[in-house]
């Protein structure tokens, strides 16, 4: 993924430099609050209503270079072969997720996309329960949520979902806490313990 890169790339577009703690600051905010924060804190020449369009452009540009992490393609193929139902629940817009996953050749593994934004952000368990219901399930313990973001992993864990934590450079500082809320923590998708899935 692109992790914390989009806000920093947006700031660079306007000649601003992201503070070292920007990623951590934004993690606790929804998209609208994050936009207002960036505009105010970095004195961006943007109105709130224009921010989302600019951010979509920034993300689309970043997604042109995203590659799969090692082991993802094989993992998805195995899950699909075993009949697992899968979807994407992301803070990013669904059409952008679909575009990059189509380019990477894995879009057909996912039944649908959920935009975890606003009132349905990953700070609230409702987005996970609604996603589970759309997959035809009702027991959160029988559903694995794969997360590289601590706040989202905590939400899923507290709601009773099985959490597979994924190491990511953007959330390296949170790794010990992410490990503590994960049923499995992976530094590589190739390390997945299939006996625990």
Enumerate the language-model features and the residues they cover:
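Helix-loop "lid/cap" segments that line or gate small-molecule binding pockets
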Residues: 10-11, 30-44, 100, 131-133
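Asp-based, Mg2+/Mn2+-dependent phosphohydrolase catalytic module
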Residues: 77-80, 94-197
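Metal-dependent phosphoesterase signature
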Residues: 37-74
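Short beta->alpha linker loops
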Residues: 26-30, 67-71, 92, 123, ...
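Active-site neighborhood of HAD-like aspartate-dependent phosphohydrolases
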Residues: 1-24
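Short, acidic loop-to-helix structural element flanking the phosphoryl-transfer center
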Residues: 60-88, 94-98, 125
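An amphipathic alpha-helix signature
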Residues: 4, 8, 31-36, 48, ...
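Residue-level detector of anion-binding/catalytic polar loops
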Residues: 17, 85, 162
């Amino acid at each position: 993924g692109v992790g914390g890169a989009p806000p920093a790339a947006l700031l660079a577009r306007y000649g601003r430099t992201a503070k070292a703690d920007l990623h951590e600051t934004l993690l606790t905010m929804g998209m609208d609050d994050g936009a207002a924060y960036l505009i105010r804190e970095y004195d961006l020449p943007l109105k709130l209503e224009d921010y989302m369009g600019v951010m979509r452009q920034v993300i689309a540009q970043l997604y042109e270079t995203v590659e799969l992490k090692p082991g993802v393609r094989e993992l998805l193929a195995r899950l699909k072969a075993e009949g697992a139902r899968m979807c994407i629940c992301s803070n990013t817009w669904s059409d952008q997720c679909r575009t990059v996953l189509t380019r990477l050749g894995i879009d057909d593994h996912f039944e649908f996309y959920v935009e975890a934004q606003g009132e349905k952000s990953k700070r609230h368990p409702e987005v996970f329960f609604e996603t589970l219901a759309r997959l035809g399930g009702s027991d959160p313990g029988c559903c694995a949520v794969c997360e590289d973001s601590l706040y989202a992993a905590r939400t899923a864990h507290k709601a009773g979902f099985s959490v597979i934590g994924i190491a990511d450079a953007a959330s390296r500082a949170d790794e010990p806490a992410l490990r503590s809320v994960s049923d499995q923590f992976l530094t590589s998708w190739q390390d997945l313990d299939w006996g625990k899935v």
